[in-house]
Amino acid sequence: MPECWDGEHDIETPYGLLHVVIRGSPKGNRPAILTYHDVGLNHKLCFNTFFNFEDMQEITKHFVVCHVDAPGQQVGASQFPQGYQFPSMEQLAAMLPSVVQHFGFKYVIGIGVGAGAYVLAKFALIFPDLVEGLVLMNIDPNGKGWIDWAATKLSGLTSTLPDTVLSHLFSQEELVNNTELVQSYRQQISNVVNQANLQLFWNMYNSRRDLDINRPGTVPNAKTLRCPVMLVVGDNAPAEEGVVECNSKLDPTTTTFLKMADSGGLPQVTQPGKLTEAFKYFLQGMGYIAHLKDRRLSGGAVPSASMTRLARSRTASLTSASSVDGSRPQPCAHSDSSEGMGQVNHTMEVSC
């Protein structure tokens, strides 16, 4: 991939164009970091605070970053024509190999939030060889039933679309207090994202099916994510229950569950420092950036105890041979057979 590809691109896929923003250039055979935002947002609203954080920029110097905007959600997007059929959540996932192939990425580390986390999880289930690892924030692995559907419809009749989306993004406490962050996002969701296009994405997300994953050993031929996963959710966030359930369905030997206090519904916005630290240890556990210098350590600071535990957990549960110099780590062993039924394993859970 030439360095001149840094910037914005519209990529042809089987289900329409995808707006993609590339930052940086490939570093050897290292994976790309690929992001996917939540419904109501775009890559800027969802990830700018996180990726502009100083310590996060120290990390991303070692990778090319690929930000994906869901169809019609980018800044300045044209409104879809009447009768346009928005891609299903499965089709959104099936659009991503076109992006990977277009830029010549061998595999990616995905960072997704909410609807974007669901899309990336589905992508990893369908195309496991393309995904090296996943950071899934606020993921809900469950489909919407009739009661949920009716509640969503009723909410749409009594609330504006931005307010309906805000109740998905933020905790009840944040909404009641009407924090500056909530006010800012209400304004930006109303003015930056095309409302008709957003309604289509919102409707499709609320029509999603179950991810259909089960923890290995709980049922014969269990299907689950085969790559290392870090689950992230804020205390009392709307997605907390869904993330807890997702954690129960993943392989505990390759999963870390990070519950962040005082972070509300958007931990990547409210606690970018803590999330960056966790992401750094997640990457180091996979064998990447082992020698990355922490800017704060030179001033005498030390990593928090919870982050140290996370680092030990990742290092103990994930084995990688020579990825520090750019080659791919050995994939985690995974079996879809019924061997090991009844084994009791515990995911590494960290609160910070």
UniProtKB/Swiss-Prot annotation:
Report the subcellular localization.
Cytoplasm, Cytosol
Give the phenotype of cells or organisms lacking this gene: Mutant mice have impaired spatial learning and memory but normal motor function.
- Sorted alphabetically, which InterPro entries does this protein's record hold? AB_hydrolase_fold, NDRG
Looking at the record, which segments are called Disordered? Answer: 301-352
Kindly state which keywords UniProt assigns to this record, in alphabetical order.
Cytoplasm, Phosphoprotein
In this chain, composition skew of type Low complexity spans 308-323
Task: Tell me which GO cellular component terms the UniProt record holds.
Answer: basolateral plasma membrane; cell projection membrane; cytoplasm; cytosol
Tissues/organs with expression = Predominantly expressed in the brain (at protein level). Detected in neurons of various parts of brain, including the olfactory bulb, olfactory tuberculum, cerebral cortex, striatum, hippocampus, dentate gyrus, thalamus, hypothalamus, mesencephalon, cerebellum, pons and medulla oblongata.
Q: What is its main location?
A: cytoplasm
Question: Which positions does the record annotate as the modified residue Phosphoserine?
Answer: S298, S317, S323
Q: What does this protein do?
A: Contributes to the maintenance of intracerebral BDNF levels within the normal range, which is necessary for the preservation of spatial learning and the resistance to neuronal cell death caused by ischemic stress. May enhance growth factor-induced ERK1 and ERK2 phosphorylation. May attenuate NGF-promoted ELK1 phosphorylation in a microtubule-dependent manner.
Q: What is this protein called?
A: Protein NDRG4
Q: Which organism is it from?
A: Mus musculus
* Lineage per the UniProt record: Eukaryota, Metazoa, Chordata, Craniata, Vertebrata
